[in-house]
């Protein structure tokens, strides 16, 4: 089956030196693009989830530094902008990785800075396509694949990680379908994954976050495929809150649990998941829905945006460098020297 070419959510307007972001807060109701010209504006867009997904925010930050350089910013301004962008969201390691890579170009001609940003974008999309090719054979024939949050084209430079595996499987002729967890409270699954897959002609059904265990028990799910925001050296995986619960359920029901992520998500400097900083977001994002408070006034809420899935619950990690199974630490260490 031929799948529609996926959207690219982060673009650079070379003629006007602007970063163009698909506003993911507006989806699925409206396909709206924002045009930004400063690092501050891009950092704010990263923080408020206008652009989200670990690889995508790395690309956005790279282009933010490129636009500053192209508009004449000097080294001091670029270093300050890099620091601001790197702190926009703490859990996703791709952001800091992209900023470090761009920072190495401070002092170079602006054209070189932009070329580096383009390279980060192009390499990410190529990595996603390779992840898809390596992950597709892992998906059982005609399976119903459960995914969480959005790890598709919208979360990357294009094509996607977890949804890249889905896309590649469909392109190879595997007639699979997808269950998309709604993913409270930002509803990345219901709003973004469902929109993206429906747009591309891939069958998708939205679930509430509490349904997965029952459907697993009924034999309606063949495997779980998720993305990642950071993978520790031992194979522990930080991903959207709710991922850990799915991994526990998958293990109980003896279902494969796959993590798909580019190598830039692997952080060998972080020993275990316990060392990964977990972003805490505002409680209003939990108790306010469509402008209406859904919990009694005065009742507090928690919103850790991510959780950590222990490596022992991960069947395999799929990166563009290869597929890693237990023992994950040894496999990741071996891939660190692979090219």
Swiss-Prot record:
GO terms for molecular function: S-methyl-5-thioribose-1-phosphate isomerase activity. It is an enzyme of class 5 (isomerase). Disulfide bonds: none annotated. Its EC number is 5.3.1.23. It comes from the Bacteria. One of its GO terms (biological process) is L-methionine salvage from methylthioadenosine. It holds the Pfam family IF-2B. The record marks 149 as: Transition state stabilizer. Pathway: Amino-acid biosynthesis; L-methionine biosynthesis via salvage pathway; L-methionine from S-methyl-5-thio-alpha-D-ribose 1-phosphate: step 1/6. Substrate binds at residues 52-54, 89, 188, 239-240. Gene3D superfamilies: translation initiation factor eif-2b, domain 1, Translation initiation factor eif-2b, domain 2. Keywords: Amino-acid biosynthesis, Isomerase, Methionine biosynthesis. InterPro entries: IF-2B-related, IF-M1Pi, IF_2B-like_C, Initiation_fac_2B_a/b/d, M1Pi_N, NagB/RpiA_transferase-like. The active site is at residue 229. It catalyses: 5-(methylsulfanyl)-alpha-D-ribose 1-phosphate = 5-(methylsulfanyl)-D-ribulose 1-phosphate. Catalyzes the interconversion of methylthioribose-1-phosphate (MTR-1-P) into methylthioribulose-1-phosphate (MTRu-1-P). NCBIfam families: eIF-2B_rel, PRK05720.1, salvage_mtnA. HAMAP family: Salvage_MtnA. Belongs to the eIF-2B alpha/beta/delta subunits family. MtnA subfamily. This is Methylthioribose-1-phosphate isomerase.
């Amino acid at each position: 089956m031929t799948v529609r070419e996926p959207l690219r959510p982060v673009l650079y307007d070379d003629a006007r030196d602007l970063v163009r972001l698909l506003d993911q807060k507006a989806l699925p109701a409206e396909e709206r693009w924002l045009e930004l010209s400063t690092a501050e504006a891009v950092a704010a867009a990263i923080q408020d989830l206008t652009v989200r997904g670990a690889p995508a925010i790395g690309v956005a930050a790279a282009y933010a530094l490129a636009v500053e350089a192209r508009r004449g910013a000097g080294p001091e301004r670029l270093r300050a902008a890099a620091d601001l962008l790197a702190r926009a969201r703490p859990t996703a390691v791709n952001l800091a990785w992209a900023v470090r890579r761009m920072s190495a170009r401070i002092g170079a001609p602006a054209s070189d800075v932009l070329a580096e940003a383009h390279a980060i974008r192009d390499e990410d999309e190529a990595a996603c396509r390779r992840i898809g090719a390596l992950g597709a054979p892992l998906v059982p024939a005609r399976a119903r694949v459960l995914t969480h949050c959005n790890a598709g084209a919208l979360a990357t430079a294009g094509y996607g990680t977890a949804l890249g595996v889905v896309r590649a499987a469909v392109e190879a002729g595997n007639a699979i379908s997808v269950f998309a967890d709604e993913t409270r409270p930002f509803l990345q699954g219901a709003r973004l994954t469902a929109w993206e897959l429906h747009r591309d002609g891939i069958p998708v059904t939205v679930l509430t976050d509490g349904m997965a265990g029952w459907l697993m028990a009924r034999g309606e799910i063949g495997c779980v495929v998720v993305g990642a925001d950071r993978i520790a050296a031992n194979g522990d995986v930080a991903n959207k809150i709710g991922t850990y619960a799915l991994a526990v359920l998958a293990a109980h029901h003896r279902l494969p649990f796959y993590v798909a992520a580019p190598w830039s998500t692997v952080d060998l400097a972080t020993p275990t998941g316990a060392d990964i900083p977990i972003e805490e977001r505002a409680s209003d994002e939990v108790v306010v829905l469509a402008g209406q408070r859904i919990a009694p006034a005065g009742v507090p809420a928690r919103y850790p945006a991510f959780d950590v899935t222990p490596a022992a619950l991960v069947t395999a990690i799929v990166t563009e460098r290869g597929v890693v199974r237990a023992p994950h630490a040894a496999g990741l260490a071996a891939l660190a020297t692979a090219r």
